């Protein structure tokens, strides 16, 4: 069952016979979507807009929410997060005074779940912490998170190269010695972006294999010169928990100057999703 998000009075539809459950979005400072309620003098206008929307017979008010934009910034974001929550609370209380019953109020994203328990209201919206990843490097992992996602592939090809051989597009890597190179069938079309080649490695047979040359659309080459008995079909760990020395989503994010959200969200539809519980495969999903 899906509830719609109402972000402004212009979205209200008055001439349909269908009743739509809605959650009202209140913009308390992110300036993305929602009824503008960023400053108390301006709140009453938005409160009136929301009141008007709630009188429409084809809208069933189920909830109201806002989104914190710096709840993952530790002390740097505390004052603004508290201001956002105060604005939201003001709107909620004003509507309650008008007799408007909001069943579900929710504000807390992953950062707020970590550090702002008083903002939980009736529901929280867990995002990146569902992956077992902290929302930023700045806040403490008070929830004792354990990364839940591992990205794996297999060795597709193994070749021996002589000193002086070039690898991948642009000939950006030249073998400084005789080398053994494995090709892994994953590339930027799968969300493993070219920037991951910078200081990047994969785990093969429990050992680190440095990425060499540019990452291609569908394939990546790694140096397995010092890893014994590498053969086609061997498991390759691209990122995971880090417990066995493999890179983590946080490592890849730091190397590419981005955030762990982007690393896990970029994993493309060509990659099957295997869901495991207590060591047992529960489901396998193919999106293509």
Segments and roles (model prediction):
Residues 153-156, 182:
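Internal, well-ordered alpha-helical scaffold/interface segments
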């Amino acid at each position: 069952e899906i509830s719609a998000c109402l972000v402004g009075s212009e979205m209200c539809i008055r001439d349909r016979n269908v009743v739509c459950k809605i959650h009202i979005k209140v913009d308390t400072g992110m300036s993305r979507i929602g009824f503008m309620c960023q400053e108390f003098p301006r709140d009453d206008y938005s409160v009136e807009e929301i009141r008007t929307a709630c009188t429409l017979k084809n809208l069933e008010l189920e909830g109201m929410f806002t989104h914190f934009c710096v709840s993952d910034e530790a002390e740097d974001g505390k004052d603004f997060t508290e201001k956002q929550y105060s604005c939201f609370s003001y709107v909620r209380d004003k509507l309650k005074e008008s007799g408007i019953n909001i069943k579900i109020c929710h504000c807390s994203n992953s950062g707020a779940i970590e550090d702002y328990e008083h903002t939980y209201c009736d529901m929280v919206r867990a995002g990146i912490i569902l992956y077992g990843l902290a929302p930023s490097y700045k806040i403490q992992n008070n929830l004792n998170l354990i990364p839940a996602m591992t990205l794996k592939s297999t060795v597709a090809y193994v070749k021996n190269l002589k000193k002086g051989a070039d690898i991948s597009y642009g000939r950006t890597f030249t073998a400084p010695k005789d080398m053994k190179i494995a090709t892994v069938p994953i590339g930027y079309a799968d969300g493993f972006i070219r920037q991951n080649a910078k200081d990047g490695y994969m785990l093969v047979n429990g050992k680190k294999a440095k990425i060499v040359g540019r990452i291609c659309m569908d394939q990546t080459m790694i140096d397995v010169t010092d890893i014994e008995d590498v053969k086609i079909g061997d498991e390759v760990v691209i990122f995971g928990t880090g417990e066995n020395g493999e890179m983590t989503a946080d490592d890849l994010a730091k190397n590419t100057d981005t955030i762990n959200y982007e690393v896990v969200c970029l994993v493309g539809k060509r990659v099957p999703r295997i869901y495991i519980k207590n060591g047992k495969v529960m489901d396998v999903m193919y999106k293509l």
